[in-house]
């Protein structure tokens, strides 16, 4: 679920950037998504959106699925669970690790998506 995704992000980036900074970034970070991603970080969000789409095709509900994960010094790791729990955790884990390695560009926060995301 979104709370766990937020915690995964914080674990992966070691608390360097608040999760809220990722909730309205580029064309894909946040609700919806369209057009061409504006940068690598936005591509992470598009990949996560696509992964959620695959989860839904498997009958999972990615926004409300609770899953288990651990935050180790080397980064987060998904725990055991049902097929849906594992799949959604893997989606979020990949995104969180992608966020942690992608540069954050302040000019892509809270952009005019109607103009820039065609």
From Swiss-Prot:
InterPro entries cross-referenced by the UniProt entry: PLipase_A2, PLipase_A2_Asp_AS, PLipase_A2_dom, PLipase_A2_dom_sf
A Pfam family: Phospholip_A2_1
UniProt key word Iron: no
Cystine connections: 11-71, 27-117, 29-45, 44-98, 51-91, 60-84, 78-89
This protein's UniProt keywords: Disulfide bond, Secreted
Cellular localisation: Secreted
Entry comment describing in which tissues the protein is expressed: Expressed by the venom gland.
Main location: secreted
UniProt keyword Disulfide bond present: yes
GO biological process per UniProt: arachidonate secretion; lipid catabolic process; phospholipid metabolic process
PANTHER family: PHOSPHOLIPASE A2, PHOSPHOLIPASE A2 FAMILY MEMBER
Family, per entry: Belongs to the phospholipase A2 family. Group I subfamily. D49 sub-subfamily.
Protein name, UniProt field: Basic phospholipase A2 homolog 1
């Amino acid at each position: 679920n979104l709370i766990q995704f937020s915690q995964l992000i914080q674990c992966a980036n070691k608390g360097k950037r608040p999760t809220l900074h990722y909730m309205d970034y580029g064309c894909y970070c946040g609700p919806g998504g369209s057009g061409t991603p504006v940068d690598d970080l936005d591509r992470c969000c598009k990949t996560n959106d696509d992964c959620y789409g695959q989860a839904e095709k498997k009958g999972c509900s990615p926004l409300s699925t609770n899953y288990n994960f651990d935050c180790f010094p080397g980064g987060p790791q998904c725990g055991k669970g049902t097929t849906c729990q594992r799949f959604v955790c893997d989606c979020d884990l990949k995104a969180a690790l992608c966020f942690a390695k992608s540069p954050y560009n302040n000019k892509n926060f809270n952009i005019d998506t109607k103009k820039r995301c065609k």
